[in-house]
Amino acid sequence: MSLPEILPLEVIDKTINQKVLIVLQSNREFEGTLVGFDDFVNVILEDAVEWLIDPEDESRNEKVMQHHGRMLLSGNNIAILVPGGKKTPTEAL
């Protein structure tokens, strides 16, 4: 039995109005509610929170957090988009 084909933009479309975690190529992470996107995967987040990650700190515990309202992220810089948002260690179990 073969699985149905799902295209990347379909996955993103199903994530509208849900929390997402976005990791940029520049070691920055954003979490917020995805309220829009286009064919280039430029995304609009509402209630966005940004973490600046120190690539030298493998524990990833040291993060500088900044709160943003609504923001636009360029699809050219997005490395990973995770539906559901950030998981705490207990949620991941």
From Swiss-Prot:
Sequence ranges assigned to domain Sm in this UniProt record: 7-87
Location in the cell: Nucleus, Nucleolus; Cytoplasm
Gene Ontology MF: a single term: RNA binding
One GO CC term on file: U6 snRNP
Pfam families for the chain: LSM (PF01423)
CDD domains, A to Z: LSm5
Gene3D superfamilies: 2.30.30.100
Keywords: Cytoplasm, mRNA processing, mRNA splicing, Nucleus, Ribonucleoprotein, RNA-binding, rRNA processing, Spliceosome, tRNA processing
Its biological purpose: Component of LSm protein complexes, which are involved in RNA processing and may function in a chaperone-like manner. Component of the cytoplasmic LSM1-LSM7 complex which is involved in mRNA degradation by activating the decapping step. Together with PAT1, the LSM1-LSM7 complex binds to osmotic stress-activated mRNAs to attenuate the osmotic stress response, probably by limiting ribosome access to the mRNA and consequently translation. Component of the nuclear LSM2-LSM8 complex, which is involved in spliceosome assembly.
Family: Belongs to the snRNP Sm proteins family.
Subunit structure: Component of the heptameric LSM1-LSM7 complex that forms a seven-membered ring structure with a donut shape. The LSm subunits are arranged in the order LSM1, LSM2, LSM3, LSM6, LSM5, LSM7 and LSM4. Except for LSM1, where a C-terminal helix crosses the ring structure to form additional interactions with LSM3 and LSM6, each subunit interacts only with its two neighboring subunits. The LSM1-LSM7 complex interacts with PAT1; within the complex PAT1 has direct interactions with LSM2 and LSM3. The LSM1-LSM7 complex interacts with XRN1.
The protein's name in its UniProt record: LSM complex subunit LSM5
Organism: Saccharomyces cerevisiae (strain ATCC 204508 / S288c) (Baker's yeast)
Gene transcribed to yield this protein: LSM5
